[in-house]
């Protein structure tokens, strides 16, 4: 499974992993797992985290080593592009339910995820995803953004 990752992705995951491997012993605790995954743009629910941990933490010692982490991230990334998850993510961003993600809505969600972005950064994210140039992101644009790597 992990062999489907690019070298760049593996390097990115290694960097994130080591940020949370505080004592440098090559393992992270399960409670740190959610934080690590969110830093990589994933947004697992508590139930998903528990499932992933149960699948990966074979000896039940509450820690995950890097190879286990890679396998899990590869599995998670493969699942992430499912249409329903993308639709659900869009609904999370589209606070007022009007079918568009505005700069304000994007800023709100990113702030809740702990990402303190400047107005310029938020505007840049909107511009990158905003194919028709109307200043906001519709569902089709969101799908394109989420599925192009």
Swiss-Prot record:
CDD domains: EFh
Every EF-hand domain range: 8-43, 44-79, 81-116, 117-149
Extra information: This protein has four functional calcium-binding sites.
Disulfide topology: none
Family to which this protein belongs: Belongs to the calmodulin family.
Matches recorded under Pfam families: EF-hand_7
Quaternary structure (record): Interacts (in the presence of Ca(2+)) with pde-1, madf-3, rpl-7A, tax-6, efk-1, npp-1, obr-4, sos-1, akt-1, unc-13, tag-196, ugt-48, nmy-2, F27D4.4, ddx-23, efa-6 and R11H6.4.
CC per GO annotation: calcineurin complex; cell periphery; centrosome; cytoplasm; mitotic spindle; nuclear membrane
Identification of the protein by name: Calmodulin
Gene name linked to the record: cmd-1
Superkingdom per UniProt: Eukaryota
Organism: Caenorhabditis elegans
């Amino acid at each position: 499974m992990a062999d489907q990752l690019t070298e760049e992705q593996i390097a990115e995951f290694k960097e994130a992993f080591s940020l949370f491997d505080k004592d440098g012993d090559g393992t992270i605790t399960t409670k740190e797992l959610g934080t690590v995954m969110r830093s990589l743009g994933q947004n697992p629910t508590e139930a998903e985290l528990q499932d992933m941990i149960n699948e990966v933490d074979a000896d039940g010692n509450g820690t995950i080593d890097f190879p286990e982490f890679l396998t899990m991230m590869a599995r998670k990334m493969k699942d992430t592009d499912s249409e329903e998850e993308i639709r659900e993510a869009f609904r999370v961003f589209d606070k007022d339910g009007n079918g568009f993600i505005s700069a304000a809505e994007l800023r709100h969600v990113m702030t809740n995820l702990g990402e303190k972005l400047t107005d310029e950064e938020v505007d840049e994210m909107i511009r990158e995803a905003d194919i028709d140039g109307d200043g906001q992101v519709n569902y089709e644009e969101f799908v394109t953004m989420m599925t192009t790597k």
